């Protein structure tokens, strides 16, 4: 008998989707543009930087044809600030995600370049893992990107051992918050759980646990509602019998 498929994305599927994130590379060799399903990649001309999908950047790194520039949020100073934010400043919430990119007009006023578009872009189509990404804010695929860069381009990351330690601390803190935040759902159907700033891998790993808690709360609420209705029906039946006796003069 085959087991049912798990609901949602598995961690391996999330890691596969993460490979579409754009990262910044410094090419060592010239490379012409490549036609991909997602569009045409920029032509690589050393030493000019270019943004490429993560999977292609890792492939060029393995071939020693490019170096990967880690995003600013993967710097040790930035990770220390995020850990401080998670453990000291906001012990119940998560670090805020990076803001949408802003572009200055002719008058110097910043605006969202995608505001006029009908399509709302989200990761991996936002530059949240390139060298222009803001520091101090974790993107949606922060954990997967960090693991892949440390596995395949650790020599391009400054203080890689310290980065690994900070990422481990950050993962443990956020995992504990994810487990404790489900206590907000114990109040019934009105329980609300904020997921702003939670990453893709964290959602995939906690999906089964959170869904189990929500389903248990739903069953408890349904049982309570059924009991209340039965009591109301029994009370209504007794009142009808008493009214009938009064009408008959008994």
Swiss-Prot record:
Residue ranges, compositional bias (Acidic residues): 231-250
Single Gene Ontology BP annotation: double-strand break repair via break-induced replication
Metal-binding keyword on record: no
Keywords assigned by UniProt, alphabetized: Chromosome partition, DNA replication, Nucleus
Protein name: DNA replication complex GINS protein PSF2
Organism: Gibberella zeae (strain ATCC MYA-4620 / CBS 123657 / FGSC 9075 / NRRL 31084 / PH-1)
Region (Disordered), start-end ranges: 220-250
Task of the protein: The GINS complex plays an essential role in the initiation of DNA replication. Has a role in chromosome segregation.
Subcellular location: Nucleus
The protein's assembly and partners: Component of the GINS complex which is a heterotetramer of SLD5, PSF1, PSF2 and PSF3.
GO cellular component: GINS complex
Family: Belongs to the GINS2/PSF2 family.
UniProt-listed InterPro entries: GINS_A, GINS_bundle-like_dom_sf, GINS_Psf2, PSF2_N
UniProt keyword annotation of Nucleus present: yes
Domain of life: Eukaryota
């Amino acid at each position: 008998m085959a087991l049912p498929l798990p609901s949602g994305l598995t961690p391996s599927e999330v890691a596969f989707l993460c490979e579409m994130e754009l990262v910044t590379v410094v090419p060592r060799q010239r490379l012409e543009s490549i036609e991909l399903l997602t569009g045409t990649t920029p032509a690589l001309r050393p030493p000019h930087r270019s943004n490429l999908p993560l999977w292609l950047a890792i492939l060029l790194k393995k071939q020693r044809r490019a170096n990967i520039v880690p995003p600013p949020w993967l710097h040790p100073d930035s990770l220390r600030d995020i850990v401080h934010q998670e453990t000291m400043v906001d012990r119940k919430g998560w670090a805020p995600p990076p803001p949408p990119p802003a572009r200055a007009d002719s008058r110097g006023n910043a605006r969202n370049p995608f505001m006029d578009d009908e399509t709302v872009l989200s990761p991996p189509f936002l530059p949240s893992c390139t060298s222009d990404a803001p520091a101090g804010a974790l993107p949606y695929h922060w954990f997967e990107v960090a693991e892949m860069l440390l596995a395949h381009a650790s020599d391009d990351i400054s203080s890689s051992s310290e980065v690994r330690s900070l990422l481990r601390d950050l993962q443990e803190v956020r995992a504990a918050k994810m487990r404790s935040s489900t206590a907000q759902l114990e109040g019934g159907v009105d329980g609300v759980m904020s997921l702003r700033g939670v990453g893709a891998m964290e959602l995939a790993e906690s999906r089964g646990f959170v869904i189990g808690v929500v389903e248990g709360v739903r069953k408890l609420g349904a049982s309570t509602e059924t009991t209340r209705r039965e009591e109301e029906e029994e009370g209504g039946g007794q009142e009808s019998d008493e009214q009938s006796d009064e009408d008959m003069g008994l």
